[in-house]
Amino acid sequence: MKSSVVDRNSSKSEIAEKECRKKTFKSSPWKNPKLIIGATVLCVLVFCTLIGQFIWDKTLVNVGSSPLNLPPVGFEYRKQIGTWAHPLGTDNSGRDLLTLILVGLPHSLGIGFVAASIGLVIGILFGFSAGYLGGRVDDVIRLLSDTTMNIPALLILIIVQSVIPNADFFVMALLLSLFAWQSPTRVLRAQILSMKHSDYVKLAQLSGASDNEIMFKEMMPNLLPFLIAQLTAGTSYSVLVLVGVEVLGLGSQSKPSLGITLNNAINSSAILRGMWWWWGIPTIILMVVFMSLLLISVGLDEVSNPRLRNQ
């Protein structure tokens, strides 16, 4: 009799625990629809481009490797019909457009991600120092941030690219990172200013923890959504500036990219000639990338801000 009662109670407690776990999982802020959609689209796009480089012939990116001016599959252009050998068509130099995208998209995203990562590291150091230490340190960092933020990144990069026309991957990432640290610095400074008066920070100070321990062990874990959001926004900004420079014809021609592809299409009057796939498909890919990064950033803002979640 007692064993049956115990079994009933244990089964009830197990059911209650399962229901509690389900409710917790459903109410988790990380199940934000915008965040999930944006991350899924971006991951699928990156995964397809990376896998495609192993299963697709990368030599088709070379000039003259394919027939000229082929339209995509299912279309006809000047009595030429698209084939599955070149499903997205070719340009007027005989380069396969699918190969240009498979090689160019990871290259552009890689530069943007590295630039944003460097900018985020600088932003963490400056933002934490300005917000937590305050005083002269805060004044100097704010002045430096406000001054450099007003400098147009595109103009500076145009000047630099005219001097260094064939800047490689890491040089370009370093140049872009010079304009990617200001936003995380300002955001993190504001967050640290509001957090440093919280109870757990005061408790850590009373326990004898150093400033570095308080900033990077106590505060930083609570800022993870903000950090990822800033990294995402920085990547989007860096890729946008990079594409802008390349579309103007000032990017490095040594490696295919979406910006260089658009520049070649513009210079060859692809729009007037009716070669819509040459400029249209890379533009759509870029729009999808920017929209997915925007959804990730907005979703992370809602994860870290309960007021936005409840609206």
Locations of the language-model features?
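Transmembrane alpha-helices
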Residues: 106-122, 212-244
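Gly/Trp-centered helix-boundary motif
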Residues: 1-120, 124, 128-129, 136, ...
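Glycine-rich helix-loop "coupling/hinge" segments at transmembrane-helix boundaries
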Residues: 149, 162-163, 192, 241-281, ...
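Alpha-helical membrane-protein architecture signal
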Residues: 22, 26, 90, 98, ...
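Generic hydrophobic transmembrane alpha-helix motif, especially the helices
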Residues: 87, 91, 118-123, 128-195, ...
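Non-cytoplasmic
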Residues: 158-159, 173, 180, 227-261
